[in-house]
């Protein structure tokens, strides 16, 4: 049986070593996020100020996996 996860949106506030980021969720929680394997393999660059989708386990709500980088409205990428 697959583990149930919550999916939230948030803003990257700080970049940490080894692909870790501090993420402020839309509900104002501050959690630690790490980059998923697909994003790492695709060389998608994540910088502070980016909006992301993050998958949070029900058992440990202080850590999450970044699964998608949302497009910024003002950037040209």
Swiss-Prot record:
Protein name as it appears in the record: Translation initiation factor IF-1, chloroplastic
Organism: Fouquieria splendens (Ocotillo)
Keyword Transmembrane: no
GO terms for MF: ribosome binding; rRNA binding; translation initiation factor activity
GO cellular component: chloroplast; cytosol
A Pfam family matched in the record: eIF-1a
Family: Belongs to the IF-1 family.
Domain S1-like, residue spans: 1-71
PROSITE patterns: S1_IF1_TYPE
SUPFAM superfamilies: Nucleic acid-binding proteins (SSF50249)
Alphabetical keyword list: Chloroplast, Initiation factor, Plastid, Protein biosynthesis, RNA-binding, rRNA-binding
Compartments (UniProt record): Plastid, Chloroplast
Predominant cellular place of this UniProt entry's protein: plastid
CDD domains: S1_IF1 (cd04451)
InterPro entries: NA-bd_OB-fold (IPR012340), RNA-binding_domain_S1_IF1 (IPR006196), S1_domain (IPR003029), TIF_IF1 (IPR004368)
